[in-house]
Design a protein with these regions (language model features):
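Active-site entrance/lid segments in N-terminal catalytic domains of soluble metabolic enzymes
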Residues: 1-160, 164
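Active-site metal-binding loops of divalent metal-dependent hydrolases
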Residues: 20, 170-171
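Conserved active-site-proximal phosphate/metal-binding subdomains
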Residues: 152-166, 172-296
């Protein structure tokens, strides 16, 4: 399935794995890339040494293109940015900050730079800075979110820039992929695996950094503190290391389990290959069937 994004990144299907911290390990990234999508190592708040280790592991498992998601608030962002050049990583997606200071070095090294954006203003700025594409991520997505839905955000970003747009947030099957392409996207990004649609809560609105997570003891405590007018420091103390606690330590009660609203649509467990091939096949069938209906 060819699009401008598959040509740009050298992948078979226009499906990109979300940059999920601690979840986006070498094993998952390699599996996604082997299946024809673009696997992504989620650097999150991890040290550069961990990211380097994951890059080496992916290279051992696949010769297909893969990328790294760099959260620019990471204390070791500078070191990781240099590491991507040293290790000849082909693609970097960025979030939680402005990647402009790294652009020149990345572009010289031939790295494809794809920032995550939540507004047309940021999309335009990233295009001007030299981004190869942007990921327009709606508020339905898991983790750090903006306020605009995918349905509203994607066409606005498509109209605002002259580089390819990848849609993210609330896409779990061929219907969502077809909708994204009708809005002008050239690929999709997926992350959330499985949960109930009623189980996500948004915390951190009072801090200006909203995050969508599965509802658990931590979100209940956080929302209670927010409603009581707790300070940023108090709220930060509660969530510090929460994602690692959930993903690495397995404490999904007191940890931060980031997930999107679309989780309720995912009702079974399948391999990366089955998911990617299935969603692309379903998308094609939907577009063809709807074209026939409209033509009647």
């Amino acid at each position: 399935m060819k699009t401008v994004i598959t040509e740009l990144l050298g992948i078979e299907y226009p499906v990109i794995q979300g940059g999920m911290a601690w979840v986006g390990t070498a094993e998952l990234a390699a599996a996604v890339s082997e299946a024809g999508g673009l696997g992504i190592i989620g650097a999150g708040g991890a040290p550069a040494s961990w990211v380097e280790e994951q890059i080496h592991k992916v290279k051992e498992k696949t010769d297909k293109p893969f990328g790294v998601n760099l959260m620019l608030l990471n204390p070791e962002a500078d070191a990781i940015a240099e590491l991507l050049v040293k290790e000849e990583v082909k693609v970097v997606t960025t979030g939680a900050g402005n990647p402009e200071k790294y652009m020149e070095e990345w572009k010289k090294a031939g790295v494809r730079v794809i920032p995550v954006v939540a507004s047309t203003a940021l999309a335009k700025r990233m295009e001007k800075a030299g981004a190869d594409a942007v990921i327009a991520e709606g508020t339905e997505s898991g983790g750090h979110i903006g306020e605009t839905t995918t349905m509203a955000l994607v066409p606005q970003v498509v109209d605002a820039v002259n580089i390819p747009v990848i849609a993210a947030g609330g896409i779990a099957d061929g219907r969502g992929m077809a909708a994204a392409f009708m809005l002008g996207a050239k690929a999709i990004q997926m992350g959330t695996i499985k949960a109930k649609d009623i189980d996500t809560k948004v915390t951190g609105r009072t801090t200006g950094h909203p995050v969508r997570c599965l509802r658990n003891q931590q979100t209940r405590e956080y929302l209670k503190l927010e409603q009581a007018g707790a300070s940023f420091e108090e709220l930060e103390k509660l969530t510090l290391g929460g994602l690692r606690k959930a993903v690495v330590d397995g404490d999904v009660i007191h940890g931060s389990v980031m997930a999107g609203q679309i989780a309720g649509l995912v009702k079974d467990s399948r391999s990366c290959k089955e998911i990617i091939e299935g969603i692309c096949r379903e998308m094609k069938n939907i577009v063809l069937s709807q074209a026939e209906n409209i033509g009647r």
